[in-house]
Amino acid sequence: MPMVRVATNLPNEKVPVDFEIRLTDLLARSMGKPRERIAVEIAAGARLVHGATHDPVTVISIKSIGAVSAEDNIRNTAAITEFCGKELGLPKDKVVITFHDLPPATVGFNGTTVAEANKK
């Protein structure tokens, strides 16, 4: 169940209308997770600096139960960075991604935790 937050200092009108849908599809393929379980939040127009400049940048946080091993992160970083380059016009050094592996007991969904739902 990946939960993704994309913060960028680009204004909302510079982010394609269906960006989050296409990012969901990319993550489903790259992470091997069903698209129905992926949540993507876009925070365009964020007051965000990288390297002490206001140059266009995106900072992405991906929280997931699994699919965030060292090998997974290399593959996913390459795919997401390429996607952001094409869709947002960002150079590779302006796409910053963090990956967080979540224990199933720390994720609530459908009225219970994922750990509890997995017991059934």
From Swiss-Prot:
Annotated GO CC locations: extracellular space
Pfam families from the UniProt entry: MIF (PF01187)
GO MF term set: cytokine activity; phenylpyruvate tautomerase activity
InterPro entries associated with the record: Macrophage_inhib_fac, Macrophage_inhib_fac_CS, Tautomerase/MIF_sf
Superkingdom of the organism of origin: Eukaryota
Listed SUPFAM superfamilies: Tautomerase/MIF
PANTHER family: D-DOPACHROME DECARBOXYLASE (PTHR11954), MIF-LIKE PROTEIN MIF-2 (PTHR11954:SF37)
Record family assignment: Belongs to the MIF family.
Protein's name according to its UniProt entry: MIF-like protein mif-2
